[in-house]
Amino acid sequence: VRKIIGLTIIVLLLTSIMMGCKSGTKVDSTDTQVDTAATQAACADTQTDTEDGSSYSTDTQSDTEDTSANSADTQTDTKDTSVNSADTQTDKEEPDTDMRDITTMQLVYDMGIGINLGNTFDSTGDWINSSEVRNFETAWGSPVITENMIKAYAEAGFRTMRIPVTWSNMLSSDYVIDTAWMDRIQQIVDWVIGNGMYAIVNLHHDSFIGELFPTNEAEGFKKYEAIWSQVSERFKDYSDYLIFESMNEPGFDAIWNQYTGTQKQKERAFDLINRINQRFVDLVRASGGNNAERHLLISAYYTNIGHANNGLTKMPDDPAGRCAISVHYYTPWTWVALEHDETWGKARWEWGTPEDYAELNSELDLMKTNYVDKGIPVIIGEYCMCSKKPKEYSDLWEIEVTRGIYERGMCPVYWDVQGSATNFFDRKTLTWGNPEVLAAMQEISATRDFTNRDDN
């Protein structure tokens, strides 16, 4: 009996010691997370200003394949800790897999005002060295993206980030996406969701959509399905904070010329877009995991409001009933983009007449009447000034377009690129070049109640 009692005491003592060690490890881990904030701040300048300061590496990318920064436990901590080191990235937990019981209309309402990570992963060109991801990422003027940049967007009040991706940039001849490219996109998605924003991932400047489909439809579908099959598989367990968008500004000039084409050609072009969108929904829904219920974004023909309302655009049949439509707003083009007169139009230097407001309201009312009021949510996936115009009028246009979209229950997603006409956000310095427009956006956003965002 004495021996048994003695052994029992020893076991209890050893258990107590082991419990203490585990507890100590947790405390040390927490301290490490807090201390990395200083490291993150010290490295930020190097990461944004030099190629060697990239926030990702081959080793890091392979380690992040099965990890995510968007779990409920890590969302609050990631704001104060760096994910720019290999140690931090490999310690990430599995992605949050929560799919809330909310409609797509409720989700779009909760998406608030969004912003694009433009001219970054959508950059493309034959002159770009395709040996490394960063060559595409920085080709059109963006620095290498860091989590500090994503965090700055979130802290400014943006609730959604659209991540345009040209998957064809790093795609094999048999349509396999390069692992490093996929890993990098996943890392960006993790940062976006980890900082409390919705992430929209699409096919952007994949020119085969406009070029291959009209000449070889079967091969076009094969390539399109191959890309979305891989993307769907990689992200199938992500929560409903990730949205897939079928395409970007798709159209078929080889089938139908918008200005000289026939009605029959027009119907053929729209039918093809409708069939591609249907195949997109069918493929994602059949891919397993949370994709069976994922909220999806359907691109209208050229994402044009007029085309979306001409009676030929058809929303896909979706067993989950979770689709929204995407259009863009760059109207009037002579004001938004033209800096010199052309044969087809004269550059405008002012905006804000009663006729201008009537045009804005008319186009947005089309989307509200024909979509929102009929239960189909609307996301204006892009809008911004594309030319340097007098600030007084340029600011007015951007503010009024944001307000008009928002007040109609739709989600405005601003097109932000580096060196843009309005110099909206500088990713290198993390500063806002147009605080007046930003403040107006924040004021507009505040008109919605997001206090119970998980249930609204």
Stretch-by-stretch model annotation:
Residues K22-G24:
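Bacterial signal peptide processing site
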Residues Y357-W432:
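Substrate-binding cleft of secreted/luminal carbohydrate-active enzymes
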Residues G118-I145, S173-I177, T215-N216, T334-E359, ...:
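Acidic/histidine-rich helix-loop elements
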Residues Q89-T160:
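N-terminal carbohydrate-binding accessory modules
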Residues W140-T160, L171, Y175-H205, L212-S246, ...:
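An active-site-proximal structural segment forming one wall of the substrate-binding cleft
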Residues I17-G20:
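C-terminal motif of bacterial Sec signal peptides marking the signal peptidase cleavage site
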Residues F221-P354, D365-C386, E407-M410:
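Active-site region of glycoside hydrolase catalytic domains
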Residues S29-K92:
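Long, intrinsically disordered low-complexity tandem-repeat segments
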